[in-house]
Swiss-Prot record:
Entry keyword annotation includes GTP-binding: no
Catalyses which reaction(s): NAD(+) + ATP = ADP + NADP(+) + H(+)
Keyword set includes NAD: yes
Coiled coil: none
Protein's name in the database: NAD kinase 2
Catalytic residues, chain numbering: D78 (proton acceptor)
EC number: 2.7.1.23
UniProt xrefs under Pfam families: NAD_kinase, NAD_kinase_C
Keywords tagged on the record: ATP-binding, Cytoplasm, Kinase, NAD, NADP, Nucleotide-binding, Transferase
Family that this chain belongs to: Belongs to the NAD kinase family.
PANTHER family: NAD KINASE, NAD KINASE 2
GO terms assigned for molecular function: ATP binding; metal ion binding; NAD binding; NAD+ kinase activity
Length: 302
């Protein structure tokens, strides 16, 4: 019997109700359904000495999810999709994202369209779009103390009531970069429309093989976002006496101490999104973020 996954934000009553209905329909169509919570993709703890789960990003993969699974349906908002990406990318399971949240920038369909979407899925009328993911590791000497997959961004920033941060950042074999700011963001093209955008970074189309370094509130007129090849590994050395907070995709994170360093590299496990229709990126930007809309209404023609 073919298997399908069902990942949901079980803290939302709407998502849970929809999941039960979808599960029933799929089982009647002859599929085995493995239903799990998106909370399994969250990786966080108070400090690197208090792990919530086994170290290593493969630990987020739910039981029953493996490369033989046809696909997984994700029910929730963008945060749920980010967690689900961490649960599915290591085993290459493609995800169909159904929005039950607010913005739904990463969603392919909405709940009112679920019946039509299921028909296309069961008829295999879909394509795969692969998005770059990153591996984020916290190192102390040669010891790996924390690790997670990242679809959007890694943000490393100061805690409240602490001073401005200083960072030395090494990108591949290039000369190190010194940045003084409240923090730094290292993002994928997918993440260029998230936190990095709010910090003044440019929008990057998803098919570009690049990464982006964006300072958060830099204390310099010369410190701006930098775009570079995604083949370049990045190392961030905190040069500040206070501990820092690291947040990955808003659903994972830990503290980073002065003696630690953060390694970021492109993952061998892209996130595989199912596309049911033509997913034209500029149209998504226009619809979700208002890109390219006129600032004033154009007069009607009579």
């Amino acid at each position: 019997m073919p298997r399908l996954g069902l990942i949901l934000n079980d803290g939302k009553e709407l998502a849970l109700k929809a999941a039960l209905s979808i599960e029933s329909k799929l089982e009647k169509s002859g599929y085995e359904v493995v239903r799990v919570s998106s909370s399994g993709g969250m990786v966080g703890f108070a400090n690197p000495d208090q792990h919530m789960r086994t170290l290593g990003y493969n630990a987020c993969v739910p039981e029953g999810f493996d490369p033989s699974m046809k696909l997984a349906i994700v029910l929730g908002g963008d945060g749920t999709v980010l967690s689900a990406a961490r649960q599915t990318a290591p085993v290459g399971v493609p995800i169909l994202t159904i929005n039950t949240g607010h913005l739904g920038f990463l969603s392919e369909a909405y709940l009112p369209d679920i019946d039509k979407a299921l028909e296309q899925v069961l008829a295999s009328q879909w394509e795969i779009e692969e998005r770059t993911s990153l591996v984020v590791s916290v190192m102390r000497g040669e010891q790996r103390r924390w690790e997670a997959l990242c679809l959007n961004e890694m943000a490393l920033h100061r805690e409240p009531l602490t001073s401005m941060c200083h960072f030395e950042i090494s990108i591949g074999r290039h000369a190190p970069v010194d940045i003084s700011a409240d923090g730094v963001i290292l993002s994928t093209p997918t993440g260029s429309t998230a936190y990095s955008l709010s910090a003044g970074g440019p929008v990057i189309t998803p098919d570009c093989p690049v990464l982006q370094l964006t300072p958060i509130a830099p204390h310099s007129l010369a410190s701006r976002a930098l775009v570079f090849s995604d083949l370049e590994p990045v190392t961030v050395f905190p040069a500040t006496p206070e501990r820092l907070m690291m947040v990955v995709d808003g659903t994972a994170g830990c503290y980073v101490w002065p003696e630690d360093r953060v390694l970021i590299r492109k993952s061998n496990h892209p996130v595989r999104f199912i596309r049911l229709t033509d997913h034209e990126f500029f149209q998504v930007l226009r619809k979700k973020l208002g890109w390219g809309l006129p600032h004033v209404a154009k007069p009607e023609k009579y």
